[in-house]
């Protein structure tokens, strides 16, 4: 009888160990893994620049925290990236509403705002510290039509059908829940509204940016198609980045 009890205990222990090992080897089986509409993969062995979470075959990059705010405002940014060219090709109307998703310090938000004097810019970020910087700069620059919006990792928190154009500059590749965020953006867009993504060119090995912080046109199109957006054009006017334009269907 003692041997049988011991035998049962061994089998039970082995079973528990096997279940735990299966969770470690395939975290998507873990009960704590998100079960959203998107298919995410999780890998314990991954790039040190990523979070171990994969979407559409791409590892999601780590977020640049608010401690890197000075890099966003660096004096050399205009010469290196020529962001002034971005706002000049957006074809904005004076009363348009623009959502700057992953706005950071509001670098682009404050440059777009004067182009839409009768509209507004939603400066959206998940970090309260970044929004504090935006609020401070808004007062300093005396710009009234920039509205800071605190988002979550999965929701941009924008009013439905309120946005004419949503723009993401070197931000999308860091979204922890890209599918859910894009769903939120699409809900916020007016019919026919546009999405503009600016990302460093993954196709070019001479763009000296970490691999997970670059995206190819093919990958961007794949991910935008997955949420129902239509590609309209890619503008090759920036020295290191793609500028890709997508559109929400009219109906």
Give residue spans per PLM region.
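Helix-to-beta-strand junctions that scaffold the AdoMet/dcAdoMet cofactor pocket
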Residues: 116-117, 175-176, 189-191
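A short acidic, Gly/Pro-enriched loop at the edge of an enzyme's catalytic core
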Residues: 156-165
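A short SAM/SAH-binding and catalytic strip from SAM-dependent methyltransferases
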Residues: 164-178
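A short glycine-rich, Lys/Arg-flanked "PGG" loop and its adjoining helix->strand segment in the class I
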Residues: 179-194
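Core SAM-dependent methyltransferase catalytic element
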Residues: 231-251
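Conserved class I S-adenosyl-L-methionine
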Residues: 196-221
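Class I SAM-dependent transferase core
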Residues: 34-93, 97
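Class I SAM-dependent methyltransferase SAM/SAH-binding core
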Residues: 99, 103-155
